[in-house]
Amino acid sequence: LKIAKEKKFAVPAFNAGSGQLLPAIMDACKEEKAPFIMAIHPDELSFLRDSFVAQVLAEINATELPVCLHLDHGANKEQVLHAIQLGFSSVMIDGSSLPYEENVNKPKKLSRLLMLWEFQ
């Protein structure tokens, strides 16, 4: 995102709810030489399965474009950990339905857990 800030352009995020959209997104971004964020919601993962993530990662690894694979609105620790194990480069845990203090503390606790997990 640093280059986007320096050059003053936006980095789009796409939710590809099916494998049919992925090639179109990749082709358009390649044509524009535009970095992008591929966001996948946990509900999409529940019906697309881990094989879809493998397909997305294969496409991402085959391009020279900077691409972020992002878990969009993870609801719990298990979803976040699963996404990281699958190879997501970014995760977001959504605590918006929680009381304010819980919403603030949930990501803090998860961040600490992930830092410990990374060093195992």
Annotate each PLM feature.
Residues 6-8, 32, 117:
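Structured helix-beta-strand junction loops
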Residues 1-12, 53, 57:
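N-terminal amphipathic alpha-helix/helix-capping segment at the start of soluble metabolic enzymes
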Residues 32-34, 85-91:
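Glycine-enriched alpha-helix->loop->beta-strand junction motifs that scaffold or abut catalytic
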Residues 10-15, 36-40, 67-73, 91-93:
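Hydrophobic faces of well-ordered beta-strands that scaffold small-molecule active sites
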Residues 63-70, 117-120:
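Short beta-strand/loop segments at the ligand-binding rim of alpha/beta enzyme cores
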Residues 19-63:
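Glycine-rich, positively charged N-terminal anion/phosphate-binding segment
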Residues 19-23, 45-54, 75-82, 96-119:
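Active-site-adjacent beta->alpha loops and helix N-cap segments on the catalytic face
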